[in-house]
């Protein structure tokens, strides 16, 4: 739905459990949460079953644009992606990308989302390949993006205004908003992958970082 629905689900579940407690004897212990919902926590079940919205953003970038603007060859980024995939496997993380939480957190704060949900929302699968023309195809899939365009913090003045700027406030807007968030993440992934692959990452931080 357009609301994240977490509070609604909690209330409905609590009411249903209350009915069970009233009608069945012998229940010794009852807890509304047992951690299987993995609220505010990254988990494999969210990647497989989805909690929130599952969304994919993809792009094909011309080789000449990468060389001119990002100063990197598509082959460098593609190979870097394979190396990063091995690193992700060895470290046991739930993300084969580089820094999806940065873009997601920025969007969440600006638009009144529950920032604590960045934990499960930032899981991502990054994929790239070279096209027959030597261009770069990239995609990112976010399996559990918990977003809303109505309810909760989305109604706060500035946050609602940001959603309205994106034409994403209110009913029937949440899937559009999810696509925008995924696009922001993909743009950040391409930028950082290019910076690392071209060895501009550290020098850029030194020149433009917060301590300057």
Predicted features along the sequence, with ranges:
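Internal helix-turn-beta structural module
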Residues: 137-212
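Glycine-rich anion/phosphate-binding loop at the beta-strand->alpha-helix junction
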Residues: 2-155
């Amino acid at each position: 739905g357009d609301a994240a629905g977490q509070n609604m689900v909690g209330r409905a579940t609590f009411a249903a459990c209350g009915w069970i407690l009233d009608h069945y004897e012998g229940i010794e212990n009852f807890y509304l949460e047992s951690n299987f919902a993995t609220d505010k926590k990254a988990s494999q079940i969210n990647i497989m079953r989805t909690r929130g919205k599952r969304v994919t953003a993809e792009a094909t970038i011309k080789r000449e644009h990468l060389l001119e603007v990002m100063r990197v060859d598509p082959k460098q980024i593609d190979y870097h992606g394979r190396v990063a995939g091995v690193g992700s496997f060895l470290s046991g993380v739930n993300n084969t990308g580089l820094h999806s939480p940065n873009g997601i957190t920025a969007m969440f704060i600006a638009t009144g989302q529950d920032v604590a949900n960045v934990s499960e929302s930032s899981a991502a699968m990054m994929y790239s390949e070279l096209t027959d023309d030597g261009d770069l195809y990239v995609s990112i899939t976010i399996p559990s993006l918990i977003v809303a365009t109505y309810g909760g913090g989305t109604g706060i003045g500035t946050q609602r205004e940001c959603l309205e700027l994106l034409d994403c406030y209110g009913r029937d807007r949440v899937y559009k908003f999810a696509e925008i968030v995924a696009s922001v993440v993909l743009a950040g992934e391409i930028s950082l992958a290019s910076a690392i692959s071209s060895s501009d990452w550290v020098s850029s931080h030194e020149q433009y970082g917060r301590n300057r």
